[in-house]
Curated annotation (Swiss-Prot):
SUPFAM superfamilies: FAD/NAD(P)-binding domain
Protein name in UniProt: FAD-dependent monooxygenase nscC
Biological source species: Arthroderma benhamiae (strain ATCC MYA-4681 / CBS 112371) (Trichophyton mentagrophytes)
Higher taxonomy: Eukaryota, Fungi, Dikarya, Ascomycota, Pezizomycotina
Function description: FAD-dependent monooxygenase; part of the gene cluster that mediates the biosynthesis of neosartoricin B, a prenylated anthracenone that probably exhibits T-cell antiproliferative activity, suggestive of a physiological role as an immunosuppressive agent. The non-reducing polyketide synthase nscA probably synthesizes and cyclizes the decaketide backbone. The hydrolase nscB then mediates the product release through hydrolysis followed by spontaneous decarboxylation. The prenyltransferase nscD catalyzes the addition of the dimethylallyl group to the aromatic C5.
The organism's place on the tree of life at top rank: Eukaryota
């Protein structure tokens, strides 16, 4: 029973949960990951990893080389690519480059990563297999720090010394422990589509515009249309697109923040009509139109942010819960830093646990919570505010984009 009590229970097998589990496992600290979904769940879209996030992970995994990450997660890894992006913002009605950094001499610092591949790569970065138990949907938490119990809907009960909430923006753990913390809905419309092309069609329709970049970002008059490579092989290319814009008044029929999950997979006729009025340039024009979109898998995404105060974090810690990832710092996907801070959360929390365990032989859980939040709280909450502000700036009027572009040209 004593050994079981020292086990750390991780709720959620996303990036943050798996990072924490992998680092704990590599250091011989017992832990179990519980995931509500089945092993075949898919989150195959791509995210941007920045140096501050992946460098900390590589170091914590034993100073793995940058090339190991690229070979494991880059969307174009199967054709020898490196997940490179040009970081350019283009006028999606003309194709003109509005803003672009000078990348001629700089080293690659941003890596585009397939989310599924990243999860698998993290899970595989060690000799011992992670203990991930799927089909475990959390029902409630009992106990306090040092002696907690997780109760699941399948009637399973597990005891441990600490619960790590890695269960996302709609965290079940957070809703029980901190019911006052409710995700803030951002008043923006966001639709996401997925489709595939033969490699030959990709080379003809998209490659002339994107060249070697794994994402082609188009910005318009208060709306965005990024095209992104999710996975690419010698014969097939899996891509996705996003269409996001600011809300137009109180009766905007496309603004549906509380749409049921099944309805969120249906394509509203109003979206098809709106896409056909955008007057897009190629390559966006070929894919973001009513006829093409009908053949894609389309999802309505509600953009939400989560803020947690230091007092809330301390209160949760007293009840045996520590937060990582979107459960406590959800931020916008486009222009956000969420995946990077999820990695940092896992690295920093694991380090706090490992340090405490090595110093005392068993975890001093009060110190673990204190030391983790001592740095992670400000870092992550600042990132939520910064990412939200950036998200709105990326939906600015076309006139402002033109002004920015002209100023860049004058400086150059």
């Amino acid at each position: 029973m004593g050994k079981q009590q020292e086990t750390i229970l991780i709720i959620g097998a996303g990036i943050a949960g798996l990072t924490t589990s992998r680092l704990l496992t590599n250091n011989g600290i017992p832990n179990v990951v519980f995931e509500a979904s089945t092993p075949d769940r898919s989150q195959g879209f791509a995210i941007s990893l920045q140096e501050f996030g992946y460098s900390a992970l590589l170091a914590a995994l034993g100073d793995l080389p940058f090339s190991s990450l690229i070979r494991g997660v880059a969307p174009d890894r199967q054709i020898g690519g490196s997940g490179w992006i040009d970081q350019a913002l283009r006028d999606n009605r003309t194709g003109e480059v509005l803003v672009a950094p000078d990348l001629t001499t700089a080293k690659q610092t941003i890596v585009r990563a397939n989310r599924n591949a990243l999860r698998h790569w993290i899970a595989d970065c060690g000799e011992d297999e992670l203990d991930v138990r799927y089909g475990h949907k959390l029902q409630r938490i009992e106990g306090r720090l040092g002696d907690v119990t997780a109760v699941f809907e399948n009637n399973a009960r597990y005891k441990g010394s600490l619960i790590i909430a890695a269960d996302g923006v709609n965290s079940t753990v957070r809703s029980q422990i901190l019911p006052n913390v409710v995700p803030e809905t951002i008043p923006l419309i966001h639709y996401h589509g997925e489709f595939q092309l033969p490699h030959s069609a990709f080379d003809e329709l998209i490659r002339p515009h994107s060249r070697q970049s794994n994402i082609l970002v188009g910005v318009g008059d208060r709306f965005n249309t990024p095209l992104s490579i999710c996975n690419i092989t010698k014969s097939q290319v899996h891509l996705d697109w996003s269409y996001s814009r600011t809300v137009k008044g109180e009766n905007d029929i496309l603004y549906r923040p509380n749409v049921p999950s099944e309805e969120a997979k249906q394509i509203p006729p109003a979206l098809l009509e709106e896409l056909d009025t955008l007057c897009l340039a190629e390559p966006w024009k070929s894919f973001l139109n009513s006829e093409s979109v009908k053949t894609h898998r389309v999802f309505h995404w509600t953009t939400r942010c989560v803020y947690i105060t230091q007092d809330d974090a301390r209160h949760a810690g007293e009840q045996g819960v520590v937060f990582v990832g979107d459960s406590w710092h959800a931020m916008p996907i486009f222009g956000g830093e969420g995946g990077n801070h999820a990695l940092l959360d896992g690295v920093e929390l694991a380090d706090a646990i490992i340090t405490s365990t090595s110093n005392s032989g068993k975890g001093s859980w009060d110190n673990v919570v204190k030391n983790y939040y001592g740095g992670a709280w400000k870092r992550s909450q600042d990132a939520v505010r910064r990412s939200t502000q950036r998200f709105f700036l990326l939906h600015r009027p076309a006139t402002e984009w033109k002004e920015i572009s002209e100023k860049k040209k004058q400086i150059a």
